[in-house]
Swiss-Prot record:
Sorted UniProt keywords: Cytoplasm, Isopeptide bond, Nucleus, Repeat, Ubl conjugation
Note: For the sake of clarity sequence features are annotated only for the first chain, and are not repeated for each of the following chains.
One Gene Ontology cellular component annotation held by this UniProt entry: nucleus
Name listed for the protein in its UniProt record: Polyubiquitin
PROSITE patterns reported in the protein's UniProt record: UBIQUITIN_1, UBIQUITIN_2
Amino acid sequence: MQIFVKTLTGKTITLEVESSDTIDNVKAKIQDKEGIPPDQQRLIFAGKQLEDGRTLADYNIQKESTLHLVLRLRGGMQIFVKTLTGKTITLEVESSDTIDNVKAKIQDKEGIPPDQQRLIFAGKQLEDGRTLADYNIQKESTLHLVLRLRGGMQIFVKTLTGKTITLEVESSDTIDNVKAKIQDKEGIPPDQQRLIFAGKQLEDGRTLADYNIQKESTLHLVLRLRGGMQIFVKTLTGKTITLEVESSDTIDNVKAKIQDKEGIPPDQQRLIFAGKQLEDGRTLADYNIQKESTLHLVLRLRGGQ
């Protein structure tokens, strides 16, 4: 049968092969056509790097399938991997290495099984089948290694109704992961969940470790109500601003919306409702602020008075 091999330069090579051909055989055919030594060739299909001893049939490569040819650069490059203990490991890699390959190298050096490793670069968790090049990881880049702890830890999630949910998590779980676990238990879609810890709303891409959330910590779950509501903010000049908000918005969120509309920095804003100054980490629901409520905005003058 015929298969195609596409190079990084965009050139496509046509090869005559059989399903029973091994990856070694295919690399030899590429060498015959293109003069590239097999030890400099890496073949990728469906996002997987193909191993020399396996056959095309093993990978379900059929007629007119397209393989991608990536060259192993002689000499490769060095990258660094920093662990939570602060130790830095140096690895010899190539841009075409997959994240699996990198985890295997870390295992060789440190003895940590790949299934206990999570690698983070530029705030993103790296997926096994992708390559360093896919993530634009270049020479002397630093990856962060977070360990998946066996057995993990328990945390609690308290809802506004007072119900407490217990979750099994790991420090390396992202907030998205936690919301997915809450959905599994309670059926609440992640896009309706807001999680608060220590007065801060937690961002989806960050991990529990990023927020220093440890075993038996309690998170607060606030629901984003679909459609939200309008409230009014009255300034000392008598001007009234209308804002689109949700009960689960924190006072910080409201100040940010006021900044968007009026250009007043949040640190110069004080919001008053029912004679009380509102605290940043709390939500509108905490203060029983409902649709069409009016807040009063007082400016903090720089330097105080």
